[in-house]
Amino acid sequence: ATLTVPTTVPSVSEDCEQLRKAFSGWGTNEGLIIDILGHRNAEQRNLIRKTYAETYGEDLLKALDKELSNDFERLVLLWALDPAERDALLANEATKRWTSSNQVLMEIACTRSANQLLHARQAYHARYKKSLEEDVAHHTTGDFHKLLLPLVSSYRYEGEEVNMTLAKTEAKLLHEKISNKAYSDDDVIRVLATRSKAQINATLNHYKNEYGNDINKDLKADPKDEFLALLRSTVKCLVYPEKYFEKVLRLAINRRGTDEGALTRVVCTRAEVDLKVIADEYQRRNSVPLTRAIVKDTHGDYEKLLLVLAGHVEN
């Protein structure tokens, strides 16, 4: 994780008082908001929201929404949410968008632990009064539907135990299906959607040793095929999440005009998880530190909070 929380944190009521102060008077004190929320973990932020509502009779998110704008507002609001609520919100937005939405749904389904995904589904129920599964079922079609529905519905085994005989059998099965271009075959999807990450890793290692190619190389038959691209991303998310997120960041930062949506999503969903590993991968791949790339591509309070969440320490 890259989030830094001070060893001694002020009391929750003090944090709330300071936030209230940041909203009062002429203009908003964005620096104060960054100093407080940018250095509190999920549990602390939840407590701040609860206490703020009890003390001032107003939802902190509504107060922030009124005071802030643009990319900075989006980053603060997403960051202030509980991780499960945030995933529910991102997933719900994804079911309403036609572009890149499949990727966001797959990312949430494959890079969260079994319990995190379960909590996201529960948060979805609470927030939208329906299930994530029914929205995904309703908004996706064809092969995308076939892959995404079992992915968002899954509850994978999390242990390290691996069945090597099964890994061998399923590597052979995957190789046969892929050789026959049966990419959306039930068996391919079953393996990716139900097996534990450790088991999938063993299967894919066996695949490479036995058939000479990384599975994602064999899934590159048609670079323009969007389903194949999603399948490759699924494999990456399950086995090398840091490589997947590095690529999302690289594409977000390197395009003409930054994709702030993707940059915001990755930084605020991974800052408490593995953003350090992702940043190391980014530097290895691009020979530039992630924080420097952020400085070059963003500005103002948005840039400041991104840097704080990415663990940047000002000298």
From Swiss-Prot:
Cellular component GO terms held in the UniProt record: cytoplasm; exocytic vesicle; membrane; plasma membrane
Protein's name according to its UniProt entry: Annexin Gh1
Annexin repeat spans: 10-81, 82-153, 165-236, 240-311
Disulfide bridge positions per record: none
Domain remark from Swiss-Prot or TrEMBL: A pair of annexin repeats may form one binding site for calcium and phospholipid.
UniProt organism field: Gossypium hirsutum
Chain residues that bind Ca(2+) 2: 253, 255, 257, 297
Similarity field: Belongs to the annexin family.
